[in-house]
Amino acid sequence: MTQLTQSSCWQALIADAAKLPHMRDLFAQNPQRFEQMSLNACGLFLDYSKNRADETTLKLLFSLAKEAKLTEKIAAMFNGDIINTTEQRAVLHTALRSKACQDIRVDGVNIVPEVQQTLDKMAQFVDSVQTGQCKGYTGKRITDIVSIGIGGSFLGPKIVSQALRPYWKAGLNCHFVANVDASSICEKLKLLNAETTLFVMSSKSFGTQETLTNTLSAKDWFLDQGATQADIAKHFVAVTSNVTKATEFGMDADNIFPMWDWVGGRYSLWSAIGLPIALLIGMDNFRLLLDGAHQMDEHVKAAPLEQNMPVIMALLSVLYTNFHGAQSHVVLTYDHYLRGLPAYFQQLDMESNGKSVTLNGTQVDYSTGPVIWGGEGTNGQHAYHQLLHQGTALIPADFIMPLQSHNPLGEHHAQLASNCFGQTQALMQGRTFEEAMAELSQSSLNEADKTLIAKHKVMLGNKPSNTLLMDKLTPQTLGSLIALYEHRTLVQGAIWQINSFDQWGVELGKQLGNDVLARIGAAHNATELDSSSNALINRFRQGKI
């Protein structure tokens, strides 16, 4: 066993999980349970009372965090220590939402002034587009933005832009392209007018295969519409570290925005990668997004573990992953604008914590990152919620809902809220056989049929969930919410003693993909790989099965 699983705290949590009463009983025994297991922070309210935990469980979890030196690990990230040890990098996405007066250093240099300069540069560009000062090659104002990226440079801007749709500047629309599948970009280009379209290309190296391929195709389309090479500077901007390649492409050096090694892709929406967001919602709202995240940064640094929202959520996830056998976690957003968040949190969590060796290279003997999935309420209630209620797998859930709607229409929002809260109650409470029989008592069925149907209507309950509320979905509350899950991911990784900030599995996929591409384009059939890979490559070369 590893040192972690041998610890007395770990062993005590195993014993505690086996003997804890049903949540129905925990609520019955403690009328103050909700008050004791809920908290406010940074415009968010967390109810974690519907979890398989009592005072003893929580004390053990906080002890586990202290044994892991969690407070010191959180501080190390904020201080710019090299916590991404396999790539020898600091992890400072938090610096992107820092205040101008802060001093945050990488290699002895304060990086805050450069961050602020980039924000100011973004503000000038955003203002020029939104006011119509920035015009296309025929003098028409920009109406459409195409964001081209992959991974964090695609998903973050897309999901945040989608979530903040009520704040979009009138007259601007945005389209997001990531997949190298030609159908993705072709379908987008069919909707566009080259004279009024702005392309934002995001790639640290300016060489990411999918992003570069899509950008080159966009350039070809642009030139085919009647534009010239000289017109590219008015319609293409880049977020990249490789200024040379971007200028060779035809971009104006003034419209090239920086990226830094101390920001990982899945944490980059706060940087110039968020330019598409800022173009849509304006720089003032983008700064509010940053401010909400900064508030959560200050909270995770300063709040005691027992009152620390990201810490509590992370420890509860560890509880289910390691002591209750949960293999997945569902995120359920009861707000149409937040429908993309499960996919964003999926990338954030699974790319960060899908690891199987500790920081010192030891193979883990415990589960790490669970599968993250989810969707939009109430749609899921007519699909996968059935499995949550009566399936054999334990799947902890996060319910997320604003108390106020951007579209207050009739009783829509009241019905949405009633479904959200009703689901959390049903998951916790379940339905006993006796309750099912009582519901059938007035039916005309005979006793044997009543008994049979009652067995099918039993729900064990004791299914855990968190409920996250906010007054209203705003740039600030969204910033807090995303930063909450970022820090939750950090805390999980700290407990599991893994590096949450590299992604070698992703890198291997890129490497092998490039090798396969070369074989697809070779003069002869593939023969050097395994029989399956050879056959698949050769079938593709033939264009038929």
UniProtKB/Swiss-Prot annotation:
GO CC term, one of those recorded: cytosol
Alphabetic keyword roster: Cytoplasm, Gluconeogenesis, Glycolysis, Isomerase
Compartments (UniProt record): Cytoplasm
Annotated EC: 5.3.1.9
Pathway(s) of this molecule: Carbohydrate biosynthesis; gluconeogenesis; Carbohydrate degradation; glycolysis; D-glyceraldehyde 3-phosphate and glycerone phosphate from D-glucose: step 2/4
Catalysed reactions, as listed in the record: alpha-D-glucose 6-phosphate = beta-D-fructose 6-phosphate
Function: Catalyzes the reversible isomerization of glucose-6-phosphate to fructose-6-phosphate.
Protein name, entry field: Glucose-6-phosphate isomerase
